[in-house]
Swiss-Prot record:
It comes from Desulfitobacterium hafniense (strain DSM 10664 / DCB-2). NCBIfam families: GTPase_EngA, small_GTP. The gene is der. It comes from the Bacteria. SUPFAM superfamilies: P-loop containing nucleoside triphosphate hydrolases. Transmembrane segments: none annotated. One of its GO terms (molecular function) is ATP hydrolysis activity. GO terms for biological process: ribosome biogenesis. HAMAP family: GTPase_Der. GTPase that plays an essential role in the late steps of ribosome biogenesis. This is GTPase Der. It holds the Pfam family MMR_HSR1. Gene3D superfamilies: 3.30.300.20, P-loop containing nucleotide triphosphate hydrolases. Residues 4-168, 177-352 form the EngA-type G domain.
Length: 441
């Protein structure tokens, strides 16, 4: 099941980014008063009472300065919050009376029909703070908090989680591969999905997704079962086309959460953009299998070196995703689209690969012998043994004499050796380093 989405909204300088950091468990978001900064740290995952969720910081919303381009952009971010959120946290400044912007935001949120929690921030004295003025916003009882000091955040999270949709697991055959097609607007997601489904004559059914607005297409190919999670299919009637690219990120997050393999679409005419990096980064952190799909290849003037140059550029821009295979296609003409499902099968298998402990440790000893760890102040790292503890993604624990001696370069060396020996193409690898005395913890 995809994680619920919690959007933090409010006018500028009420403490949204500070609250965002609190709810994200201290993960770094840039906190400044300069417009646009928080857009670089738009989303993070968090957990409370066993429920995982995604937090979105929408930036400051202003209605009073309605003629400025910045204000218009912030209002579009309000639309993003309304469209995407399961729960909205409306942050206000408890130290001043409600402003006209607060009133306008409250009106917008009331019309949304979504659960809205009013978070009265910057409360210094919980016993003496009067919040009766904020009842006029029509959003119920304010929850007093101090994001800076972390006070009453637990009560706020209790309220947030109480509004989440029921946590119901999907009933899907374990052998079915769930494919998420993600990417920026107009990169060709719908065309690719239509081409894939158009070529596969045995469409089994349309399955309502666990998100409230997704329709998943189930089909068979050569006796194998697939479900396409189509983010492009999440478009609603209205003004969705006008929303900013943050909306596409948020839609993609939901698809990524529910997938086994991700088809990350890139536009051959534009290369890798900052928005592409955000989506790819989330896919990498989620531990899913991934294929980089360069679409609109038919529109590119080419020579015999064009493909190699383009792939090199991708590797430079997405340096953290060197393991992902790349396929150049045209969803419009069908060029190489038939190869996609074979690649999906391969990547799904790689992401589920298990390595026997005895085999792994024999190789680890060889790797350490070939390239001994460097010393640090006279002390040398000793890799005692290793074991695989999970798949999707493949996850390994390395027990060592002192985890602080594991330099990132040696960690990278071990990961490269794992890939050289066992493949894991299209799959991230998780490495956990523990001291021997941590084994029993």
């Amino acid at each position: 099941m995809s994680k619920p989405v919690v959007a933090i909204v409010g006018r500028p300088n009420v403490g949204k980014s500070t609250l965002f950091n609190r709810l994200a468990g201290g993960l770094v978001a840039i906190v400044e008063n300069r417009p646009g900064v928080t857009r670089d740290r738009l989303y993070r995952d968090s957990e409370w009472l066993g429920r995982k969720f995604t937090i979105i910081d929408t930036g400051g919303i202003e209605f009073v300065n309605e003629n400025t381009s910045i204000s218009a952009q912030m209002r579009r971010q309000a639309e993003i919050a309304i469209e995407e959120a399961d729960v909205i946290v409306f942050v206000i400044d408890a130290q001043i009376s409600p402003t006209p912007d607060d009133d306008m935001i409250a009106q917008t949120l009331r019309r949304s029909g979504k659960p809205v929690i009013l978070a009265a921030n910057k409360v210094e004295n919980f016993a003496k703070t009067e919040l009766y003025e904020f009842y006029n916003l029509g959003l119920g009882e304010p929850v007093p908090i101090s994001a800076v000091h972390g006070m009453n955040i637990g009560d706020l999270l209790d309220e947030v989680v109480s509004h989440f949709p029921e946590d119901i697991e999907e009933e899907v055959d374990p052998d079915t591969i769930r494919i998420a097609v993600v990417g920026r607007p107009n990169v060709g997601k719908s065309s690719l999905v239509n081409t894939l489904l158009g070529e596969e004559r045995v469409i089994v059914s349309n399955i309502p997704g666990t998100t409230r607005d997704a329709i998943d297409s189930a089909f068979e190919h050569e006796g194998k079962h697939y479900i396409i999670i189509d983010t492009a299919g999440m478009r609603r009637k209205g003004r969705i086309e006008e929303l900013t690219e943050q909306y596409s990120v948020s839609r993609s997050l939901r698809a990524v959460d529910r997938s086994d393999v991700i088809l990350m679409l890139l536009d051959a005419g534009e290369g890798v953009t900052e928005q592409d990096k955000k989506i790819a980064g989330y896919a990498h952190e989620a531990g899913k299998g991934i294929v980089l799909v360069v679409n609109k290849w038919d529109l590119i003037e080419k020579d015999d070196k064009t493909m190699n140059r383009f792939e090199k550029d991708i590797r430079e821009e997405l340096g953290f995703m060197q393991y992902a295979p790349t396929l150049f296609i045209s969803a419009k003409t069908g060029q190489r689209v038939t190869k996609l499902l074979d690649l999906v099968d391969f990547v799904a298998e790689q992401n589920s690969t298990r390595v026997a402990t005895a085999t792994l440790n024999t190789l680890v000893r060889e790797w350490v012998h070939l390239n001994p760890p460097p010393t640090d102040k006279g002390r040398r790292l000793k890799v005692l043994y290793a074991t695989q503890v999970g798949v999707k993604p493949p996850t390994f624990v390395f027990f060592v004499n002192d985890h602080e001696l594991m330099h990132f370069s040696y960690r990278r060396y071990l990961e490269n050796q794992l890939r050289s020996s066992f493949g894991f193409e299209g799959s991230p690898i998780r490495m956990i380093v523990r001291q021997k005395d941590e084994e029993r913890e």
